[in-house]
Design a protein with these regions (language model features):
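Residues within helix-turn-helix
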Residues: 78-79, 90, 97, 117
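N-terminal positioning helix adjacent to the helix-turn-helix/winged-helix DNA-binding module
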Residues: 29, 33, 62-64, 124, ...
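Exposed, interaction-prone assembly regions rather than primary DNA-binding/catalytic cores
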Residues: 153-179
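Short amphipathic alpha-helical segments with heptad-repeat character
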Residues: 31-34, 38, 42, 72, ...
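Base-recognition residues in the alpha-helical recognition helix of bacterial helix-turn-helix
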Residues: 39, 65-70, 93-94
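Charged, amphipathic alpha-helical coiled-coil/dimerization segments
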Residues: 3, 20, 97-160
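N-terminal leader segment of winged-helix/HTH proteins
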Residues: 1-59
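N-terminal helix-turn-helix DNA-binding core of bacterial DNA-binding proteins
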Residues: 46-88, 102, 171-176
Length: 179
C-alpha cells in the first residue's frame, strides 16, 4: 500500500535532530527547514512575550496578539474574528471574552447593524500592539548583530520570494495548527 508508514522514517526528526551540527554548506534533510523556521518563530514569540510581561502585559499570550491584529483598527464582530483567525465563532467568542476580561478589547454596538456587537481595541490593547512592534524591532536587531544584517536581509528576501504575497501576513495560524 502507498500509505504504509515507513518505520525507518517515523520519529526521524526526534532522532536525527538532537543537536547534530551540520557542516557549512552541507545538504540538510528536507524536514529540517520547516522545523528551523518554526523554532525561529517560536523563539521570537517567546522572547516577545517575556518582554511584554516585563512591560506591563503579563497575561498577553501569542493567540491574543493574533486576535488583536485580526480585530484591527476598525474593529470586528466575533464572526469576523473567527473567519480571520480560521477558528469557530464559539472559539472566537471565547477569545473575545478573554481579551475583554484582560482589558485589551471592549464591545460596542455595530454602527451599521444594531443587532451586532463590534469588538474594539482598548488603549491597553493598542499599547500591547505598539510595544510588540518595538520589541520585534529590537529582536530583529539582535538577530542582525548575531549573524550580520546582510544575512537577516537575505533571509527576509528569500522568504518573500518563496512565500506568496497573499500568504505573508495571514492570522489564521491558530486555526490551521489546531485542526
Amino acid at each position: 500500500m502507498d500509505n504504509m508508514v515507513d518505520d525507518k522514517k517515523v520519529n526521524q526528526v526526534v532522532e536525527q535532530g538532537k543537536g547534530i551540527p551540520h557542516a557549512e554548506g552541507a545538504d540538510t534533510p528536507g524536514w529540517e527547514l520547516p522545523f528551523l523556521l518554526l523554532a525561529g518563530f517560536r523563539s521570537l514569540i517567546d522572547r516577545l512575550h517575556t518582554e511584554l510581561a516585563a512591560q506591563g502585559h503579563p497575561d498577553a499570550r501569542p493567540a491574543h496578539g493574533f486576535a488583536m491584529q485580526a480585530i484591527g483598527q476598525d474593529g470586528a464582530t466575533a464572526s469576523e474574528l473567527g473567519r480571520r483567525l480560521g477558528i469557530s465563532k464559539q472559539a472566537a467568542g471565547k477569545t473575545a471574552d478573554r481579551l475583554t476580561a484582560l482589558g485589551y478589547v471592549s464591545t460596542a454596538p455595530d454602527p451599521t447593524d444594531a443587532r451586532r456587537k463590534l469588538l474594539r481595541l482598548t488603549p491597553h490593547g493598542l499599547d500591547a500592539l505598539n510595544r510588540s512592534a518595538a520589541i520585534f524591532e529590537s529582536l530583529r536587531a539582535e538577530w542582525a548583530e548575531s549573524v550580520g544584517p546582510g544575512r537577516v536581509h537575505d533571509l527576509e528576501a528569500a522568504l518573500r520570494t518563496v512565500v506568496p504575497a497573499s500568504d505573508r501576513y495571514r492570522l489564521d495560524a491558530a486555526g490551521w495548527l489546531g485542526g
